[in-house]
Amino acid sequence: MRGSLQFLCDYFGITRQGYYKHVNRKMEIDILTSSIVLYCNELRKLMPKAGMRELYACCLRKFGVRMVIGRDQCYNIFRANGLCQRVRRVRPKTTNSNHNYYIYPDLLNVTPKFVADTFGSMVVADITYVATCQGWAYLSLLTDAGSRAIVGYALCKTLEAEGPLKALRMAMDFYNRYNVDLNNLIHHSDRGVQYCSNLYVGMLKKHHINISMTQCGDPLHNALAERMNNTIKNGWLFDCTDDSFEQLDKRIADAIYAYNYVRPHQGIQMRTPMEYIRKCSGKVAEVPLVGTGAPAPCREGDPRAKSFCYLMKVYSPKSCTYKRRYIILQNI
């Protein structure tokens, strides 16, 4: 027996308007679901190991008021489409504390505990290792504790102090561009021989940076730096065993750029680190960390910039300024 739509609506006690609204909403949900999957697949090219929280935060920024799907349903979409990632846990050890250098007091793990809640109040340092086809490479990272931004990095083939020194020079140049008073900055690290060496400590004292070091081998006393090692290695450098040292250096530059400008961070209300710095400093975040040494500009012909724009489905034929590049990233 066949009946008219009006008859069926009357029979079930609903209006024709309600029926069509239900049908249209289901179509909208299906279209949004497909868009979310396509968008997250593009994000995976840039952030291969990002968690579901980061993907969901990016979707909220991308779709705005059209994001009518809740968090749990969005997580189910990620699971159903293979967008969840399983992180392999590793615990590298690169600290050599068997030396005769002076170990400075710990200014972080005190009572009451020091909390770095502003940009430019504390920078944490650590070294981790990455496997390449040419052997081990050692990555030195400096992270601003308030904004979670990576402000300095260097990749070296040895564990000598030159790597941390290069990262420190980059970090000081970064802070100077944002008019951060280095006299109020605390540098916190483990008690490894690189950070206690005369060269490294001399550089810190020359710029009147306060020195803080852990007093034991507990990684929790430098937890943010250890966490940063895990984020960069398991988020971007998980499949680089076939890369050369030069290829790894480029991948690290791309990874840190994506971390600072694209990846939302739970500790700063799901903002990106450079968004947080812009909010604190009142200026547009202009200086991406690209390559080694001092931060370099984005020029036409820069393969790092072109590959990044391609991944985000944006092509800029003309030379772009930092501001325009930043806006492009915010509108993906």
Can you name each region flagged by the protein language model?
Residues N198, K205-I209, T231-I332:
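C-terminal domain-tail junction helix/linker
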Residues V68-L141, K166-M170, F174-R177, D181-N184, ...:
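Mobile-element integrase/transposase regions
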Residues R88-K93, I186-R191, K205-L224, C240-F245:
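RNase H-like polynucleotidyl transferase catalytic core
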Residues N179-S197, Q215, N222, Q269-M274:
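Acidic/histidine-rich, metal-coordinating catalytic segments
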Residues D144-A145, C156-E162:
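A short acidic/small-residue loop/turn micro-motif
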